[in-house]
């Protein structure tokens, strides 16, 4: 396979010999490079693999495009245009946000390809999206969610999403040994995207509740995961909660709380990040705690309202007077 052939310096043979690379080999090489950079298999599949292997490559085959030299700006613009006119599984046009998720990995791949010597002459354009405020949950709504949860386990899960900004996959991976203490402060060791580890601050009350939850379960669970199912597995032990199980619980609790909103774990994380910014947390510090890049913070949290902007300026200019 062309994707397995390498020249000196890790470049595809096609680039080293001056011949344009086949598009399918280029995709394979790029995904290999992403994995070598430390991206997790999950991130690779969800953020890059689907867009490149299931959307971009089939489109190239339908259009008869075989090599990078055929990916002119006009051709790449046609790729974006075709996506904008494509229908989703529900029979509706793809949203501009969905088109972004498919186009961005192609742009990143072509940028990488240019860096290794491929004859890249264009980039697919990202359709302009209307900027609007994203929905968030208020502290009152989060309190209602916790009140509606039926078990202490579920209440603690709600709080970890809302007060620590954890991702769904991060929460289900927590073990009892991930609770760390230094002097009078508590932290949660979290394994985030790309298997990167970070410490997330946990306020005293929530830390105590985590301790009690761990002690209550004791050794009556399969493995070392902190959050387990109330049902026992075939071995008589409580099995770890799955991501789908947690997501279903959050949705069910939201219906019980009658919030009138579609609530999911990421909305709780998003609400936490928005609140931290509104209360003046440094975006660089927030990115480190949340396990997100500063670029993501800038792109996805530019939705703060005019009132938020006014308050930020007032704090900066009037706070010390």
Give the predicted meaning of each segment.
Residues 200, 220-222, 247-288, 292-295, ...:
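Short, basic (Lys/Arg/His-rich) helix/loop patches that form interaction surfaces
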Residues 42-43, 192-212, 224-251:
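C-terminal catalytic core of Y-nucleophile DNA break-rejoin enzymes
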Residues 10-13, 28-43, 50-133:
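N-terminal core-binding DNA-recognition domain of tyrosine recombinases/integrases
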Residues 116-119, 129-147, 195-205, 218-226, ...:
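DNA breakage-rejoining catalytic core of tyrosine-based enzymes
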Residues 1-17, 315-321:
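C-terminal secondary-structure termini that scaffold catalytic or DNA-interacting sites
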Residues 136, 194, 290-315:
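Catalytic-site neighborhood detector that most strongly recognizes the C-terminal catalytic loop/helix
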Residues 139-168, 194-196:
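Basic, Lys/Arg- and aromatic-enriched nucleic-acid-binding interface segment
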Residues 169, 173-209, 296:
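Conserved tyrosine-mediated DNA breakage-rejoining catalytic core shared by Y-recombinases
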């Amino acid at each position: 396979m062309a994707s397995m052939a390498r020249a000196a310096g890790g470049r595809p043979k096609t680039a080293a010999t001056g011949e344009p690379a086949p598009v399918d080999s280029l995709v394979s090489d790029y995904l290999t490079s992403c994995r070598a950079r430390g991206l997790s298999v999950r991130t690779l599949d969800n953020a890059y693999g689907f867009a490149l292997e299931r959307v971009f490559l089939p489109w190239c085959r339908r259009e008869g495009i075989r090599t990078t030299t055929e990916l002119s700006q006009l051709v790449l613009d046609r790729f974006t245009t075709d996506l904008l006119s494509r229908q989703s599984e529900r029979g509706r046009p793809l949203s501009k946000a969905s088109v972004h998720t498919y186009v961005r990995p192609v742009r990143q791949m072509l940028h990488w390809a240019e860096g290794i010597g491929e004859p890249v002459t264009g980039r697919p354009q990202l359709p302009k999206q209307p900027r609007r405020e994203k929905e968030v949950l208020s502290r009152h709504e989060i309190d209602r969610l916790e009140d509606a949860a039926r078990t202490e386990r579920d209440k603690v899960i709600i709080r970890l999403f809302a007060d620590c900004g954890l991702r769904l996959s991060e929460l289900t991976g927590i073990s009892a040994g991930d609770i760390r203490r230094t002097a009078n402060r508590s932290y949660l060791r979290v394994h985030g995207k790309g298997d990167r580890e970070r410490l997330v601050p946990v306020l005293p009350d929530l830390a105590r509740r985590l301790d009690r939850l761990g002690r209550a379960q004791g050794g009556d669970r399969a493995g070392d995961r902190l959050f387990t199912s109330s049902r026992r597995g075939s071995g008589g032990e409580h099995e770890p909660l799955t991501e789908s199980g947690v997501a279903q619980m959050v949705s069910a609790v939201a219906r019980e709380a009658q919030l009138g909103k579609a609530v999911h774990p990421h909305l709780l994380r998003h609400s936490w990040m928005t609140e931290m910014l509104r209360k003046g947390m440094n975006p660089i510090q927030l990115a480190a705690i949340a396990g997100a890049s500063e670029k993501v913070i800038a792109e996805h949290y530019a939705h703060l309202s005019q009132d938020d902007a006014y308050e930020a300026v007032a704090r900066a200019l009037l706070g010390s007077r």
